Curated annotation (Swiss-Prot):
Acts as a chaperone. It comes from Desulforudis audaxviator (strain MP104C). Belongs to the heat shock protein 70 family. Residues 571-607 are annotated as: Disordered. NCBIfam families: PRK00290.1, prok_dnaK. This is Chaperone protein DnaK.
Length: 607
């Protein structure tokens, strides 16, 4: 059975892991890193760059660089680059495709299946978009699991005692808090809450806003209008945030940040940890609301939590750790790597699916209530939030008017009392209802949530047996035809990438052969046969001319044409050197053998 890999598709960084020898291990990417920046760049020549190489060129190419695309999953947001439009699913698929390729290189075998993690508070549309991204990248997404749940798996797989844990997951762009009960291999989520628009990026933005304001005060120049300067500020802000986790003061020094009529301007500011915490105090407080909500939903007091797991790079900030410490009255657990534990948990779930990991049961929940719009614009819940999934629930409704021939089922997700305040997941019609006074027809509406948190809704007229159903893909979901088109484009790009890499290798080999040939000629020209020298020089010239053009087949041909003369030339040189090293007749060769026996005996004394 082929391997199923675990992927943490993050807002700022992504990570992948796999089960090896009964243990989940993080797989390094092609550059040797254990995490991959979730950044996609498009070079001026049209080449797609993903990961660290895309992040490195972002300063000089901000218009063609895409970051934090995860924040737009499940929306109709489009990225426009050089006249082309890309959906968040397509950009995410490019990141997943790189991870798939790197995993294949690490494992030495094809990777076609994956478990991908999402924030616990992701809506149905966002989950479906993640699944679509996997499909576009050529991966069969075997399971979508929640990030806090994955982190709990990574922490609790080898724990035997029963315990209640809280996962505090503050990533690059999203925040989740989940409460789980662990015991006898069962991981049961009791409650989850969160904020899909809160993460490390927001802390970076506060530093950026502060730098822009300070620089404007000093120089009168507004850097927010300069895209290249803003990209430099973004990198500097992230670096400052990271540094302030270990030092109390950091220097932000960006020479030649901009210029005016007087000449170039340099940016040099000091940011203290105290000032940073002042700038971000409200963001810290925003994490406490969902934390209180999850505790309330689980019916627990802070003292009943045995362990608090910190997940996501942003939890390294001292102010975050202090807020958690203050709320729960105890130190958070720091025994897991906040950047890698989610991918490790995804790999463990993959191991459960393949049978490599036994005696583990994962019981997750739906983060938001699901229901339909009823008379008066009211939101009627059919499945309450924090219900264990998979699950199915039914409720019977009736018509609102006499002789109503059809009903529109407006499917919603959220917690507000009125339909307008919640997110629309989809609409569909049940038609062919026989004429009858209002209140007589019986319409059974069934909600079915699978293990991935994907919703199916059906409506059935109990009188006629007629039914209609819909798999919710969200108003921004992609059709099968769109996904197929994107899959083909992704495959085509992968093929183009393979060809481009092959061309680079052919050119590199040809360059190396030219260098080797010219070096050999330079060292041995004087001792060589003039005809061989001439033949080799001509072959070198032909290959150099081929390298100036773009005809790869010609380069391959001329490389082969140079290999023969070079081998013949070096073989002749080797043979000549071997002959020169053989011993010739020495100076005593003509002497009589008897001369060697004419030894003179003599005494000597030491003086």
């Amino acid at each position: 059975m082929s391997k199923i890999i675990g992927i943490d598709l993050g807002t700022t960084n992504s990570c992948m892991a796999v089960m090896e020898g009964g243990e989940a291990v993080v797989m390094p990417n092609a550059e040797g890193g254990r995490t991959t920046p979730s950044v996609v760049g498009f070079s001026k020549t049209g080449e797609r760059l993903v990961g660290q190489v895309a992040k490195r060129q972002a300063i000089s190419n901000p218009e063609r660089t895409v970051t934090s695309i995860k924040r737009y999953m499940g929306t109709d947001h489009k990225v426009r680059i050089e006249g082309n439009e890309y959906t968040p699913q397509e950009i995410s698929a490019m990141i997943l495709q790189k991870m798939k390729t790197d995993a294949e290189a690490y494992l030495g075998s094809k990777v076609e299946r994956a478990v991908i993690t999402v924030p616990a508070y992701f809506s149905d549309a966002q989950r479906q978009a993640t699944k679509d991204a996997g499909r576009i990248a050529g991966l069969k997404v075997e399971r979508i699991i929640n990030e806090p749940t994955a982190a709990a798996l990574a922490y609790g797989l080898d724990k035997e005692e029963d315990q209640t844990i809280l996962v505090f997951d503050l990533g690059g762009g999203t925040f989740d808090v989940s409460i789980l009960e662990l015991g006898d291999g069962v991981f049961e989520v009791k409650a989850t809450s969160g904020n899909n628009r809160l993460g490390g990026d927001d802390f970076d933005q506060r530093i950026i806003d502060w730098i822009v304001a300070e620089f404007k005060k000093e120089s009168g120049i507004d850097l927010s209008r300069d895209r290249m300067a803003m990209q430099r500020l973004r990198e500097a802000a992230e670096k400052a945030k990271v540094e302030l986790s270990s030092v109390v003061n950091t220097n932000i020094n960006l020479p030649f940040i901009t210029a005016d009529a007087e000449g170039p301007k340099h940016l040099d500011l000091n940011l203290s940890r105290a000032k940073f915490e002042e700038l971000t105090a409200d963001l810290i407080e925003m994490t406490m609301g969902p934390t209180r909500q999850a505790m309330q939903d689980a019916g627990l007091e802070p003292k009943q939590i045995d362990k608090i797991l910190l997940v996501g790079g942003a939890t390294r900030m001292p102010s975050v750790q202090e807020a958690v410490r203050r709320f729960f009255g105890k130190e958070p657990h720091k025994g897991i790597n906040p950047d890698e534990c989610v991918a490790i948990g995804a790999a463990i779930q993959a191991g459960v699916l393949t049978g490599e990991v036994k005696d583990v049961v994962l019981l997750d929940v739906t983060p938001l209530s699901l229901g339909i719009e009823t008379l008066g614009g009211v939101f009627t819940k059919i499945i309450e939030r924090n219900t264990t999934i998979p699950t199915a629930r039914s409720q019977i409704f009736t018509t609102a008017a006499d002789n109503q021939p059809s009903v529109e089922i407006h499917v919603l997700q959220g917690e507000r009392q009125m339909a307008a305040g919640n997110k629309t997941l989809g609409r569909f019609n049940l038609v062919g209802i026989p004429p009858a006074p209002r209140g007589i027809p019986q319409i059974e509406v069934t909600f079915d949530i699978d293990v991935n948190g994907i919703v199916n809704v059906s409506a059935k007229d109990l009188g006629t047996g007629k039914s209609q159903s819909i798999t919710i893909t969200g108003s921004t979901g992609l059709s099968d035809a769109e996904i197929e088109r994107m899959v083909k484009e992704a495959e085509q790009y992968a093929e183009e990438d393979r060809k481009r890499r092959e061309e680079v290798e052919i050119r590199n080999n040809a360059d190396a052969l030219v260098y080797q040939s010219e070096k050999t000629l330079k060292e041995h020209r004087d001792q060589a046969d003039p005809n061989q020298v001439s033949e080799l020089e001509q072959a070198v010239d032909r290959l150099k001319k081929a390298l100036e053009g773009g005809d790869i087949e010609r380069i391959k041909r001329e490389t082969e044409n140079l290999t023969g003369p070079l081998h013949a030339f070096t073989a002749a040189m080797y043979q000549k050197q071997a002959q020169q090293q053989q011993p010739g007749p020495g100076p005593d060769a003509g002497k009589d053998k008897d001369d060697k026996d004419k030894t003179v005996d003599a005494d000597y004394e030491v003086k």
